[in-house]
Amino acid sequence: MSQWQDIKDFHEKFALSYDGPPRDLPTDLSSFRLGFIFEELDELIVAETKTEVLDALVDLVYVIMGTAYLQGFDFQEAWRRVHAANMAKTRGPSARSQEYDIIKPEGWTAPDLSDLAGE
């Protein structure tokens, strides 16, 4: 079973399923979801143990994927496209001057997600 299926199962269990085209969330639901994301991010910021960090990371991804699900996005295909574009990047110096930085090489193209967003 995939994480995406887990997200679908969770939302179906609580009668929150959505199986339509990509959509904007109603303002109240969007505000709730964004608040929920910030709450989980705050848990990550204040985490003091590796266990707390891991829990916060999983919760954050879970809520974000749930939000994508409720918007009707094909998250798996979007992930595939973004991953492919990221794999075309290279490691090198950037304006941030971080040794861990990954940069967009000459000719790099961002993934087109417009069809998945219904635009």
Predicted regions and their residues:
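Flexible "arm" and connector segments at domain edges
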Residues: 1-57, 61-119
